[in-house]
UniProtKB/Swiss-Prot annotation:
This is Elongation factor P. The keyword Protein biosynthesis applies. Belongs to the elongation factor P family. Gene3D superfamilies: 2.30.30.30, Nucleic acid-binding proteins. One of its GO terms (biological process) is peptide biosynthetic process. HAMAP family: EF_P.
Length: 188
């Protein structure tokens, strides 16, 4: 769908020079002299990088519609994660690169939203939190309570994270997947 610059809004997805970008920020400028333009901050959906771009009033932009599907992780295979569509149970490989940093904290059957463009997966939106059991934790040193004492633990999926020293093996913890930090202990 073709848009004029005044129709561009935050959250839209645009096709610019063959790449897909999500609009992060827009600023419409109408100077006293000369023609109007719009300054934008765009996030590349395939490369996960951001650019700032200015579009002149006469330019036409192409808006695209993305399909979002609720899917769950089945298993990993080579460089792919095999997802299953929650509606029709179709299995589809998706590149690990979309969730590479949080993969060690994801269990099988974790629900996620997978974004598609022209039938191909272009992004994965993971949940904000993961609840996992601690499988290995060293004992905290007695008296080591100055500041925010932390230790390294391993969770059931094999991921390692820093947690407060009171967390023990067998505890179930909540991890924030946006920044890979410990949130709290949860009851079993």
């Amino acid at each position: 769908m073709t848009l004029g610059i005044t129709e561009v809004k935050k959250g839209m997805v645009l096709k610019v020079e063959g790449d897909l970008y999500s609009v992060v920020k827009t600023e419409f400028v109408n100077p006293g002299k000369g023609s109007a333009f719009i300054r934008t901050k765009l996030k590349n959906l395939t490369r996960n990088s951001s650019i700032e771009r200015t579009f002149k009033a006469a330019e036409k932009l192409e808006s695209v519609e993305l399909e979002k599907r609720n899917m769950t992780i089945c298993y990993t295979e080579g460089d792919d994660i095999i997802f299953m569509d929650s509606n029709d149970f179709e299995q589809m490989p998706v590149s690990k690169e979309y969730v590479e940093d949080i993969l060690p904290f994801l269990k099988e059957e974790t629900p996620m939203e997978v974004t598609f463009y022209e039938g191909k997966p272009i992004g994965v939106i993971p949940p904000n939190f993961s609840i996992l059991e601690v499988t290995y934790a060293e004992e905290g040193l007695k008296g080591d309570t100055s500041g925010t004492a932390q230790k390294r633990i391993t969770v059931e999926t094999g991921g390692e994270i820093n947690v407060p020293i009171f967390v023990k093996q067998g505890d179930v913890i909540k991890i924030d997947l946006r920044d890979l930090t410990y949130v709290e202990r949860v009851s079993k």
